[in-house]
Amino acid sequence: MSVEGYIGLPPDSSGKRVRTIVKQIEGESRHHEVFCITSPRTLLGVYHYCSSMVSGSTSADFIYHAILNPSDSDRNMALRRIILHIVSVKQATPIEIAVWRITSLSGGVDVDPSRICKKDTNYADPIVIIREGSETNPISTTIENKICGTMTPINAGQYLWIEFNFANAVDQRSDFILHAGEGICMRNEQAGDVDFRILWIIEWEEFKGIGVIT
């Protein structure tokens, strides 16, 4: 006969939470001590956003979509995943489209915050700024570091759906952190083609505390 019980203890001197597992196996007690995984973050919400599908641009460095953690924000953002979806409606010239870290954001069209999906409706409202670029109202940013990129499809009817995943497989937390005043954008790396249709899907968490996962 085997009986298993759990004893929860307060954090030890190092601050780690300890759980003692007691097993009764054929009349013999066996004790196992395990550490419970904790995080230095206070999670405020996990969010999902799917952009409009916008037409391609012939302009090099044209920015289609951007998201920014406001400069006065008291939260951090952690990117979980980015999905790029690009369709070629006619024969088109292939180019690279990339995602970059940015440290400023102006221009473009503001996206209504109600279009951001809370993964749990009980989460707090998100604080991010999201904008879409157009030829008449282009987005301007300060480009910092290239995060990822892909080549566009060539033939009519071809499409690309590619996911860049930054989440930890165990707890789905990400260590790709965007502090106040930081964000990401999606842009042409060369002169593009109007026969592309482009959207992105982003998932992120907003939290208080430090970004390191322990």
Where are these regions (language model features)?
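Short, well-ordered helical secondary-structure segments
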Residues: A66-N69, N165, D171-R173, E189
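Extended, low-complexity segments enriched in Ser/Thr/Gly and acidic residues that occur primarily
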Residues: M1-I116, E132, T141-T150, A156, ...
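Long hydrophobic alpha-helices with heptad-repeat/coiled-coil character
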Residues: S2, Y49-V54, W161-G183
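Ser/Thr/Pro-rich, low-complexity mucin-like regions
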Residues: V170-F207
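Extended, solvent-exposed segments with strong compositional bias
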Residues: N122-F176
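A surface/secretory-pathway sequence property marking extracellular, secreted
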Residues: P113-T121, D125
